[in-house]
Amino acid sequence: MKHMFLPFILFFCSSNLMASDFFDAFKADKINSTLYVIHGPRETPNPKNRGFMNNPAFIVAEKSVVIVDPGSSHETGTMVLREIAKITSKPVSHIFNTHIHGDHWLANDIIQQSYPNVKIIADPRMIKKARAGAAQSWTDNLISMTEGATKGTKIAYPNESVSDGKQLKAAGLTFNIHSVGIAHSDSDIMIEYVEGSTLFTGDNVGYLRILRMSDGSFRDVIKALDRAISLQKKHYVPGHGPTDNVKIAELQREYFHTLYSLVVKYNEEGLEDFEMKSKIEAALVKFKNWAGFDEQLGKNISIAKLEAEKAEFE
């Protein structure tokens, strides 16, 4: 009888070893004296990356640790806790979630299991969407996209809301909240870490990664990027891709502004989305090698065209 279970046991052990090997390859990059970022893969969630594709970040304060976007799963959250433990034994007191998309925040639960009193902070729109079913939808989608790699991840909802203009103290540090309209997902906050001269942009900015806009507004995300650029911080942590300076927000604005303004132009000339694609692609040639360019360009043009047509009646 025991031999019947041997293939299952071997598969289970093999899967765990594969997960361990994958996550062991990622280390926290030190950005300044208090800030660390684990830069994730730039591909969309799949079995190989086990759903991990964002940039979990953490700040080591005087008495505790603040996490921003811990990632997509219990495995990603475990990796974040592992990297924190390499640097400090201080507890995690706060988690910021930048928006509703589950690749950024479904690791909340594994953090909360270790630190039950952790405050999980997000926009009220995100909290409402999560509790209305988006959290479960994202959990199910990630299981499907990764062929079961994220299975076992549970939902820990944000328990404190913040909106645009809010300044708060977390772990003795100062954070300003920036939110502009619908932007990337109609649930976004950008988090300005004042003492660290850092802006966590969420998915309002991707660097070397083209962002999907199926839940967003091109006009609002451009406004959000204008805000981000105006802050002139030393460090910008994007939702996906390497951390850098303000240039990554400027590049993201260039992509969105170029795409949307050309869609408006060609829409006024009577072109359909498929007819304008090659013209817009030529104008965005500098972004051609960014991850997701071919996959997202046509979709983004179609979404921008719908927004431009709607704007004609406003």
Question: What kind of feature is each model-predicted range?
Answer:
Residues 20, 230-232, 243-314:
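Accessory terminal helices/loops
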Residues 4-13:
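Sec-dependent N-terminal signal peptides
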Residues 33-83, 189-201:
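Conserved beta-strand hairpin/beta-sheet module of binuclear metal-dependent hydrolase folds
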Residues 20-31, 64-66, 72-74, 128-258, ...:
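Metallo-beta-lactamase
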Residues 15-19:
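Sec/Tat signal peptide C-region and signal peptidase I cleavage site
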Residues 34, 59, 69, 84, ...:
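Divalent metal-coordination and catalytic microenvironments
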Residues 82-159, 167:
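Active-site HxH/HxHxD metal-binding segment of metal-dependent hydrolases
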